[in-house]
Amino acid sequence: MALKHAAAGEAVDLRPLGPRLSAARTHAIVRTSSFEAVRLVVPAGVEIPSHRVPGRITLQCIEGHAQLGLSDATIDLRAGDWVYLDGDEPHSVKGIEDASLLLTILFGPDGKTPEPLPD
C-alpha cells in the first residue's frame, strides 16, 4: 500500500523510528514541481550505487549511520548531520548501521534542472 503524500500545512513525524527502523521502507513525503522530500531508509550493508540527481539535494541523517560516497571523498553521516550537494553530482549512499535520512531535492522551473544560484 502506498503512503499518502503530505498536504501543505500538514505536520509530518520525522522522529527516529528506533526499533521500527529495520522494517521501515523508503517513502516520498511530498513532491511538487519545485521540490521533493523523501524519508530514505538505508539498511546496514546496503549501498545505493553511484547516481546523479538533476536538482540540488540535502541529506539530513535522522538516525543510524550512513556514508555518502562522492567522487573525491566519503562523508560519514550520523544522527543530526546534514550535507548539501549541487545538482548532477555523482554520489552513493551506504548504510553502515540501519539509517534513516531526510532527502530533499530542489528542482527548477522545468521540474528537473536546478535553479541557477545567484552570483
Task: List where the protein language model places each region.
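A short, N-terminal "cap"/entry segment at the start of jelly-roll beta-barrel domains
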Residues: 1-36, 117-119
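Histidine-centered metal-chelating micro-motifs
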Residues: 47-49, 83, 87-92
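Conserved short histidine dyad/triad with adjacent acidic residue
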Residues: 23, 36-53
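Short, conserved beta-strand element in jelly-roll/cupin
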Residues: 41, 52-67
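Short, charged, intrinsically disordered terminal tails
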Residues: 109-119
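A cytosolic small-molecule/anion-sensing beta-strand core signal
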Residues: 62-63, 78-79, 97
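Short acidic-glycine-tyrosine-enriched beta hairpin
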Residues: 72-88
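Ligand-binding loop in jelly-roll beta-barrel domains
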Residues: 87-110
